[in-house]
Swiss-Prot record:
This is Methionine import ATP-binding protein MetN. ATP binds at G38, Y39, S40, G41, A42, G43, K44, S45. It is found in: Cell membrane. Residues 2-241 form the ABC transporter domain. It is an enzyme of class 7 (translocase). Belongs to the ABC transporter superfamily. Methionine importer (TC 3.A.1.24) family. The lineage of its organism: Bacteria, Bacillati, Bacillota, Bacilli, Bacillales. It comes from the Bacteria. One of its GO terms (cellular component) is plasma membrane.
Length: 341
């Protein structure tokens, strides 16, 4: 559905060239939800502007829904954009128009008959859960409702690809989850390919099939979400994974415990998939002559399974402690002894 081959984007400035996107190659499958994550300045927004043709790449090929976006202009580009739609962080609604009129706006521009515009708008209002708000104005809506209008408007022309540029960044956590649930539902119902740009790993964890991590204009890591959670290779990726797998203030807590612990081992257990549901601690206490203290932990769900991190302190005879660690690894649970934070 989407293929980027050796794509680069260089902006000229009075201080020299700015390499916003550097040699990015990605392949996004039809019907999947693909996440692109990175901190501010990583090149995410520049990349999404290349996908919808708002910018031309300095080099490389951008193909979306069978069209090489970098090679078309004018009418050809406008036609290609009918297959690509977008929602934004700040909604970009027309404040003088009602919910229904906002949704009908792209159809109006496309020259669709009024009766068909109204029919399509009503279908979309039902799809995004805004029944009863048809005649409301944006100023009368909550942030989540405004984004639902934005999603409905983006779907008006039956696009094949939906680009989401930090679409939940301006929302509270509960509303964020409701919007992500809606996007996941739309993906399943319509088979829509969704590309999510975000700096929040929670968004990736909740609904994405695959993820690419960007830093300084480059894709530094890419893969299935659960695989990336399980084995993050780059330091940047590890920091993102820690956002959702470790409780806040983990570093300070562990350092305090390390300083106060005279014996035993502090161990981080990493669970993936079915291993997250094993009664591991019970078996350790039952089968070995050690004491086990649970320090803190967290389990998160991805679309492909559970991922969890648990910090424990194991105390006892050195040989018996090592036996416990081998036992843990035999259970397909990663065990890492923490010596410093």
């Amino acid at each position: 559905m989407i293929n980027l081959q050796d794509v680069s984007k260089v902006y000229k400035s009075k201080h020299g060239d700015v390499n916003a996107v550097q040699n990015v190659s990605l392949s996004i499958k039809k019907g999947e939800i693909f996440g692109i994550i990175g901190y501010s300045g990583a090149g995410k927004s520049s990349l999404i502007r290349l996908l919808n043709g708002l910018e031309k790449p300095t080099s490389g090929t951008v193909e979306v829904a069978g069209t090489k976006i970098n090679e078309v202009n004018g009418r050809g580009l406008r036609k290609a954009r009918h297959e690509i739609s977008m929602i934004f962080q700040h909604f970009n609604l027309l404040w003088s128009r009602t919910v229904r009129d906002n949704i009908m706006f792209p159809l109006e521009i496309a020259g669709v008959k009024k009766s068909e515009r109204i029919k399509r708008a009503n279908e979309l209002i039902k799809l995004v859960g805004l029944e009863g708000k048809e005649k409301s104005y944006p100023s009368q809506l909550s942030g989540g409702q405004k984004q639902r209008v934005g999603i409905a408007r983006a779907l008006a022309n039956n696009p094949k690809v939906l680009l989401c540029d930090e679409a939940t960044s301006a929302l509270d956590p509960q509303t964020t989850d409701s919007i992500l649930d809606l996007l996941s539902d739309i993906n399943e119902r319509l088979g829509l390919t969704i590309v999510l740009i975000t700096h929040e790993m929670h968004v990736i964890r909740k609904i994405c099939n695959r993820v690419a991590v960007m830093e300084n204009g480059k894709v530094v890591e890419e893969g299935e979400v659960l695989d990336v959670f399980k084995n993050p290779k780059e330091q940047m990726t590890k920091r993102f994974v820690q956002q959702v797998t470790e409780p806040e203030e983990t570093k300070e807590t562990l350092q305090h415990l390390l300083d106060d612990t005279a014996s035993g081992k502090m161990v981080q257990l990493t669970f993936v998939g079915e291993s997250a549901e094993q009664p591991l601690i019970t078996e350790m206490i039952r089968n070995f002559n050690v004491s086990v203290n649970i320090l803190q932990g967290k389990i998160s769900q991805t679309k492909d399974g559970a991922y969890g991190s648990l910090f424990i302190h194991i105390d006892g005879d050195e040989e018996e402690v090592q036996n416990v660690i081998r036992f843990i690894n035999d259970k397909q649970v990663k065990a890492e002894v923490i010596t410093n934070v």
